[in-house]
Amino acid sequence: MTMKTSVAARLRWIVAGLFAAGSLMAAPPAWADGTPRRVVSFNLCADQLLLTLADPAQITALSPYALDDSLSVTTRAAVPFPRVGWDAESVINLSPDLVLAGPTDRPTRAMLDAAGLHVVEVAFVTDLAQAQRQAREIGTLLGHPGRGEALAQQLEQAETGLAAAALKPPRTAAIVQRGGYAEGSASLITAMLTVAGLRPLAAVPGGFGGFVSMETLLVDGPDVLVLLDPPRDAADQGALFITHPALRARYDERHRIDLSSRYTMCGGPALVQGLDRLREALTPLR
């Protein structure tokens, strides 16, 4: 398993395990005029929202993942900004007036809270309505409600475009990544596929997903196989599963969608691009 793919897979499993119903968790803003001036992001999804919604002068630092183009769609915009380490000290030393953290950062958050910093938790989103709500909330938090509304409208327009291109009648789909791990129904990508006219295969574990066998995919498989971050060759055991010749033969380009997980882990601009990419990917399936 490559480093980048293992990071993407690990983040997806964490997203599943730490699903939160709300988009934002925080106390009221601590700054006087309602506009934070020194914002640090400690989270991949927060990076992308911050780069999209904040003024450059508001951004003090981003997370270590900010320049990883296998995970983020805003790497070019992230280049000018410093990045923190995976430790509370690197954040505290910057004296931010707002820290955007994720649900996975709780031990670090406890240290940031103890240091008196204002920390907002940016929750993972698992449906499109949450993504729109999150865009509005973060935009307002940063003092730019108009930008948050504009991003929410972009998300809505991308969803509408995908819905207009949806497969009819609906078909079954399984979302599989390295090693045969299949996404369950409680995921953002499943919500995206539902809009596209693709419903989960009954044989795939529900909820947050689980592993599916090669036999299931070949004998009782879906109409469409969605591969997340498919490797080009069988360089390791994880890649061997989804590059298997029988699987390739069963799911040719008319029955397969290849999609980068960077479009399916976060809301915001990543989701806008992901909805558009998925709409384009439906064309060969018709």
Model region roles, listed by residue range:
Residues 2-18:
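Bacterial N-terminal signal peptides that target proteins for export
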Residues 37-50, 146-198:
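Basic- and aromatic-lined ligand-binding clefts that recognize polyanionic substrates
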Residues 37-94, 98-104, 201:
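A short, structured surface patch at a secondary-structure boundary
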Residues 37-38, 130-140, 149, 229-286:
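Structured C-terminal subdomain patch of bacterial secreted/periplasmic proteins
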Residues 65-70, 77, 183-210:
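Alpha-helical, coiled-coil/dimerization segments enriched in small aliphatic residues
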Residues 88-96, 115, 212-221:
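Short helices/loops that flank or line small-molecule/ion binding pockets
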Residues 124-137, 172-191, 234-236:
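Extracytoplasmic ligand-binding site segments that recognize negatively charged/polar headgroups
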